[in-house]
């Protein structure tokens, strides 16, 4: 029997990698970078062999899509931000067996779910950036999962629950990573400038993000799940916060009773709100 050994909400913003090289960002993202490294270390210490990544930069329309390739490799340039993320080489194993199980388990509940083995299918930067810090040694297999922007909150919740069931049916120990922002209202072009790297675009969004972190810290997960449908819409959720909805579906939704541990300070990035939080399973 398999096991879910770790679950976390993580950041993947381009400024993480840029902060290792360029002023004025140099060194400013050490907190979240160290948080990603810590999550990777904890996954290994708990015997994880696979990262399942809910990737808000792999956008899909209809159904649920899982990258089931046995190996992921390529050179990635972001079509939305080629000036920030370009020619990033990635190379790590996949897990076709677990991907197939996730698709099969999801289909039992009704929705279309497809596990793709297509050599030309790329991996998006919502997976590539965290793997840069968590999986440089290629020791862990990776299953990227798309964010379906036309799925309802309830459909994404049920999908997350199916992922956990599939993991438990498998022979693998997996860590789930919800890779995406909290609020996600980026700046208009006219408001861009050096200071935008470290500013939020909306005080309302910032206050809502901080309220969410308070609810998590206080263990008030039923209240959070009740507000999540509104939060996704009113705070400009990245891919409608599909990753967060799937994560809480995987955790048991409003029945989750574990502890949320914030691993870095909340930080703004180009208008969005970012954080790294582990949701403990014991």
What is each model feature region?
Residues 1-49, 60-158, 169, 189-282:
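Flexible, D/E/H-enriched segments
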Residues 49-55, 145, 172-182, 247:
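Beta-strand elements within well-structured catalytic alpha/beta cores of enzymes
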Residues 160, 178-183, 273:
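Glycine-centered flexibility sites
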Residues 161-169, 174:
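Non-transmembrane, aqueous-exposed alpha-helical and coiled segments at domain scale
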Residues 182-190:
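A structural signal for small-residue-enriched, beta-sheet-centric alpha/beta enzyme cores
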């Amino acid at each position: 029997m398999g096991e879910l050994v770790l679950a976390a909400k993580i950041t993947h913003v381009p400024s993480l990698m840029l902060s290792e090289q360029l002023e004025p960002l140099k060194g400013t993202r050490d907190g979240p970078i160290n948080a990603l490294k810590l999550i990777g270390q904890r996954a290994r210490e708990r015997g994880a062999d696979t990262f399942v990544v809910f990737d808000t930069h792999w956008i899909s329309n209809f159904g649920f899509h899982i990258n089931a390739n046995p190996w992921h490799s390529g050179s990635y340039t972001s079509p939305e931000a080629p000036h920030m993320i370009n020619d990033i080489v990635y190379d790590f194993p996949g897990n076709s067996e677990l991907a197939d199980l996730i698709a099969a388990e999801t289909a039992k509940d009704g929705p279309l779910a497809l596990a793709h083995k297509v050599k030309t299918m790329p991996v998006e930067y919502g997976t590539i950036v965290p793997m840069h810090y968590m999986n440089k040694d290629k020791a862990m297999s990776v299953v990227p999962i798309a964010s379906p922007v036309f799925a309802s909150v309830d459909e994404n919740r049920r999908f997350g629950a199916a992922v956990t069931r599939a993991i438990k049916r498998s022979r693998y120990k997996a860590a789930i990573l919800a890779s995406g922002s909290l609020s996600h209202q980026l700046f208009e072009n006219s408001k861009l400038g050096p200071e935008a790297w470290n500013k939020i675009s909306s005080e309302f969004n910032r206050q809502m993000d901080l309220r969410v972190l308070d609810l998590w810290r206080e263990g008030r997960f039923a209240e959070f799940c009740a507000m999540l449908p509104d939060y996704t819409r009113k705070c400009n959720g990245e891919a409608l916060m599909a990753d967060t909805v799937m994560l809480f579906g995987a955790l048991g939704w409003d029945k989750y009773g574990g502890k949320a541990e914030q691993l870095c300070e909340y930080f703004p990035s180009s208008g969005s709100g970012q954080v790294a939080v582990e949701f403990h399973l014991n």
